[in-house]
């Protein structure tokens, strides 16, 4: 039963909105808008060459985070996404605790989580496909690291390096 309204409470499995992710051909092309016009500060970023993408997160004064994704290499999920859907919203990430239990709960409720990846304790994830979520890819994520340590763990590139490689 997917409606979620029967027996619904104000609680839920998501602890908080983590970030909104935008697919772009070049992160460097988005930085002037995100940083200089809208006022976000660079938080962290890295190149995930094995997965065919680079990412950069920017935090706004109120705490909201936008993540920019750009493809690296000649193929991969992000390059495919940009070919079929063009630049724009890629996914919304929600933080959860005990992600494996949350995945089972979703399945029990009739949802079909896809692409679970629980190998890295610093970032465990599972997705809800846009076909089931009114066109929005939803990522549920859990990290065993405190948030400050996540930034330290993932801040592999400073912004200038990231933009130069973009």
Please provide the spans of the model-predicted regions:
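Short, flexible turn/loop "capping" segments at secondary-structure junctions
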Residues: 10-14, 84-85
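Short loop/beta submotifs within extracellular cysteine-rich repeat domains
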Residues: 30, 41, 64-66, 76-77, ...
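Vicinal oxygen chelate
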Residues: 1-12, 24-32, 36-38, 46, 56-59, 66, 72-73, 84-132, ...
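Feature marks short, surface-exposed loop/turn motifs that line or immediately flank catalytic pockets
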Residues: 72-75, 144
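Regulatory and interaction patches adjacent to catalytic/ligand-binding sites
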Residues: 81
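Long, hydrophobic N-terminal alpha-helical segment
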Residues: 13-54, 58, 76
